[in-house]
Every structure is written in C-alpha cells, then in structure tokens.
Amino acid sequence: MSVSALSSTRLPGSFSGFLQAAALLGLLLLLLKAAQLYLRRQWLLRALQQFPCPPSHWLLGHSREFPIDSELQQVLKRVEKFPSACPRWLWGSELFLICYDPDYMKTILGRSDPKARVSYSFLAPWIGYGLLLLEGQTWFQHRRMLTPAFHYDILKPYVGLMVDSVQVMLDKLEKLARKDAPLEIYEHVSLMTLETIMKCAFSHQGSVQLESRTSKSYIQAVRELSDLALQRVRNVFHQSDFLYRLSPEGRLSHRACQLAHEHTDRVIQQRKAQLQQEGELEKVRRKRRLDFLDVLLFAKMENGSSLSDQDLRAEVDTFMFEGHDTTASGISWIFYALATHPEHQHRCREEIQGLLGDGASITWEHLDKMPYTTMCIKEALRLYPPVPGVGSKLSSPVTFPDGRSLPKGIIITLSIYGLHHNPKVWPNPEVFDPSRFAPGSARHSHAFLPFSGGSRNCIGKQFAMNELKVAVALTLVRFELLPDPTRVPIPITRLVLKSKNGIHLRLRKLH
C-alpha cells in the first residue's frame, strides 16, 4: 500500500482528534468563565451585604422586576422600602447600587470617580470622548477651555436668539391649534431647542424649524440612539462590541450614528466656511468672548497644539445632543405640569404679563424678575428631572454618613428621579407644590439636582434655565395650556426623561 493511501486513511482520525481537543478546550474556557462569573457574584454579594434588596435570579438578576418602560416606577418602590440606597442586579454577575438620598449624593458627587463603563462607553461611537465621557486631566483641560463659552457676556445676547426660536415654534403651534385637537408637543419643542442651540452655540444661520427635514432626521437619530443605548445596557449578550456590531440593533445604531455625525459635520464645515469669508475672521478675533464652536476652533491645548478634528467633533456631538434634548425634555414636562395645575399656570401668566406689559418681549433683565414662575419651573424639574440618573464606578473605597461602606470597583447610579420623589426628602413628593422653592425655604444642599452636582455638573445649566424661562414666559402670554385627559404621559427613562406615549396638550389662544 502506498504512503499516500496510508496518510489518507489516517486523516479522519486526526481530524476527529482535533475536534475533540477543540471541544475540550472550549469546555475548559467555558468552565473558567463560569468560575470567574461565580467568584465575581460572590464578591459582589459580600461587598453589598450591608445593602438589602429584593431577591434576584442567579442569571437574570432583577431584569424581570425592571421592565424597560416601568423602570422609574420600580425605582420608586425601592425608595419607599429601602433606606438611602438599594442594589439592582443587571444579571448574575453585574449590579449597581441605586442611590436616592441627599447625603449619599453629596458623598459621591464630592469624589472624582470615573464614569461607569457598563453604560457610558456605549455612547462613545455616537458622541465620542467629549466633556461627558472624558476623565482625569484631559476632562479638566476641556472643561476649563469651554467654561468661557458660558460666561455672562456670552449668555446675555443669547436671550434674543432664544426669543426668536420660541416665537417661530409658537407661530407653528398656533396654526395647528386652530384644529382644536390635542397636539403632541415634544417634537415641536425639540426642533425649537435644536434651533436655539445651533444659533447660540454654533453660529447657525436660518431657521431649523422652517427647514426641518435634515433636522428631523437628526432628532430621529438621537431618539433611536437613546433607545438603543438603554437596551444595550440591559442585554448581557450586547456588552461585547464585536457581537453588538453583528446584531440588528448594532447595525441600526451604526446607521443612526452616521446620520447624527452628518448633521454635526455639516455644522462644523459651515462655520469653517463662514470664517473664510472676508473680514469674518478678524470680526471673531475682536470679540471679547467667543461662542462655543468658535472656542473649539480657536482652542489651543496646554501643549500649544490645536484641538484635533476628532476631539472637536466629539465636543460638538456632545453639546449638540445635551444642549437640545435635555432642555426639550425640561420644557415639555414643565408645560405638562402647568397644564395640569391651572391655578399655578394662571398665577405665572399674571406675573409675566405684569412684567412684560402689552406686546413687549422678554429680555435678559426680565429673567430674574419672575420669582413665582421660577418656583414653578423648579418644582416641575423636581417632579420631572430631564436627566433621571447618572452613573460612576468607585475608584477607591467609600464610607457613607450612615456608616455603610463599599469597596473599590462598585458601580453607583445616582437616581435623581428617585431623590426628587423620596418622601423622606420631599414630603408628599407627588404633589406639585412650588412653595417648596419659595425664597428662604431650607433644604439639603443635594436634595435638588436637576443639573447634577459637584465638579462635573452641567456646564450649560445657566443657559438651560434661561431657555426654560424664555419658553415658559412667551408661551403663557400667548396660550392657555390644557391637558389631554385621555392620554396622560407615562415617564420613562432614556438618556433623558421621555414619555412612553408622548406629551399631548391642547393649546387655547388667548385674546
């Protein structure tokens, strides 16, 4: 018999042996991974033994108790039953501690822990490593670089731009309101806040609301990316970037990222083209203060280098999203709160009419002269905080004021929604009571956190408050807001606070 014939008869046996070896290796790796997950679960159980929680499934965690669209309601049940904080198991080997006590908030926000990778890193393909995702010295450099873009001298002329954008929205709503049918207002408010941020921070010319096709595509992309990010956090099989890219959700996320980036790239290129026009560059350089995008374009890092294109777009993507979606959430929920509490709406309207007189528009000087309206805005932000929660990962052990402690490596979620609805912090928390924010009223320094707190609080919080006041004031002097009793909004958590079924209101023209 030839050698080749002998070799061919042995090949099946050799291949079978290879398969057996591969199967054994795979089984060994699987057992090692299972042992690793088991040991991590045991470590987490010991680390969190001071923090009781409802029983969890060894594999599914608390996922069955936290359906994606009733998550906030489940958090409130924990707030009532477990003091200060409660663990939530995402799955068998991953959990985070939900905190909703002001002392716990103060402790965590006073630290410099990094963001929790299990949630925030999933945003990187979309918004890049801008101010939201950066850590350490690089974050500090970017924060210091961008702070001048929110100086008093910059914010003051923005009020006129805010007024223009709100008036365009109200003109559109007036035409739609003639049909005397309830309107879903969130999309209209989103287009208005997107136009505002593009005019104020990115030197955009024209009206996003009137030329809204591409802007609607961007807003739709933001909505999809927000939904997909939350779904990914909750799916153990989507933690791997490789597996996620292969999934239908991963492909949808990639396409939505492309749409969002096309929008921000267009904004950057338009501003660069404007700066090439004769005299424009010198005009900008003579400004005492630069707006947000110009700060980025003219920025010099500490080593003398300009901001890279990648870093520039990350900051633009971050602020384009945060600068419009959070304020859209805030304004929409404020409108709903006032619609369902007509006595407070009426008192706000009287205050604003007394301030503005007949036909006058709102200016910078008016913003600090509407105390009751400001109280109502803050109470609505308490009930409906635009950002329901923020997360971090402990970089060192921590001991809380009640004596309980945690080791390094635990993920912390600060539930701002839970804090704002905590009856031990806010008596009768579901009651809309603007007097909580009356001048001179006392409360814990970390009981009210609509813009987070600590060194990483919202850099644009004053910009946002100004926009909320302008939108509320101009809307109330033009319309009476009425609820749609057949469609009560259901708060759900995405990246910002949304409504599962939209926010529907009837607008009745005044005069």
UniProtKB/Swiss-Prot annotation:
- Which top-rank group of organisms is this from? Eukaryota
Entry's Gene Ontology cellular component terms: endoplasmic reticulum membrane
PROSITE patterns cross-referenced by the UniProt entry: CYTOCHROME_P450
Induction info reads: P450 can be induced to high levels in liver and other tissues by various foreign compounds, including drugs, pesticides, and carcinogens.
Can you supply a Gene Ontology BP term from the record? lipid metabolic process
UniProt EC number? 1.14.14.80
Q: Which residues bind heme?
A: 322, 458
Q: Which reaction does it catalyse?
A: an omega-methyl-long-chain fatty acid + reduced [NADPH--hemoprotein reductase] + O2 = an omega-hydroxy-long-chain fatty acid + oxidized [NADPH--hemoprotein reductase] + H2O + H(+)
UniProt keyword list: Endoplasmic reticulum, Heme, Iron, Membrane, Metal-binding, Microsome, Monooxygenase, NADP, Oxidoreductase
Q: Which GO terms describe its molecular function?
A: heme binding; iron ion binding; long-chain fatty acid omega-hydroxylase activity
Q: Which residues form the propeptide?
A: 1-4
Q: Which family does it belong to?
A: Belongs to the cytochrome P450 family.
**Described function:** Cytochromes P450 are a group of heme-thiolate monooxygenases. In liver microsomes, this enzyme is involved in an NADPH-dependent electron transport pathway. It oxidizes a variety of structurally unrelated compounds, including steroids, fatty acids, and xenobiotics. The kidney P-450 system is rather specialized for the omega-hydroxylation of fatty acids. Both P450-KA1 and P450-KA2 catalyze the omega- and (omega-1)-hydroxylation of various fatty acids with no drug-metabolizing activity, and hydroxylate prostaglandin A1 and A2 solely at the omega-position.
Name-wise, this protein is Cytochrome P450 4A7
Gene expressing this chain: CYP4A7
